Amino acid sequence: GRFVRGLFPDQDGKLVPDYTLDASMYGLFAFGALPADDPRIESTMKAVGTELWVKTEVGGVARYTGDYYHRVSDDLGTVPGNPWIITTLWLADWHIARGTREDLERARNLIEWAVGHAGGGNLLPEQIHPYTGEPVSVCPLTWSHSTLVKVIMDYLLKLESVKLN
């Protein structure tokens, strides 16, 4: 089982789960509600890494299934939404928190993906075009930059602790 996006009342007032996969579920471990290795977090983040992964040469993680904000494709099986820098880095941060060598390698690849999508002047956009790799929407986005700095710091600290053990 993984987490649901939310519960919403139907016309009779009964709460109905919204099963839309959403990368923001990362917050459940990022804000300390549950550890990164909790089975529900693991199931959710693994689903984020597979089901929200953009299946083009560009790659990256979409915000949620069917994200329509600046959508450039209706092929939701291939492009569940445009890839975002922050959501891809959230997946990296989860791998860092898990801390296995395999997870750290995956995190490094995701960090390199984000850095590789910096535009002129090393500016990071909000989103990436899923087919061309060009910036979409806001650029630069401070949130993308600050998330990159945080994730790199987490990565280096975890890498050092793994070397010490």
Predicted regions and their residues:
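Extended ligand-binding clefts on enzyme/binding-domain cores
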Residues: 1-86
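C-terminal capping/lid segments that line or modulate ligand- or cofactor-binding pockets
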Residues: 15-39, 81-165
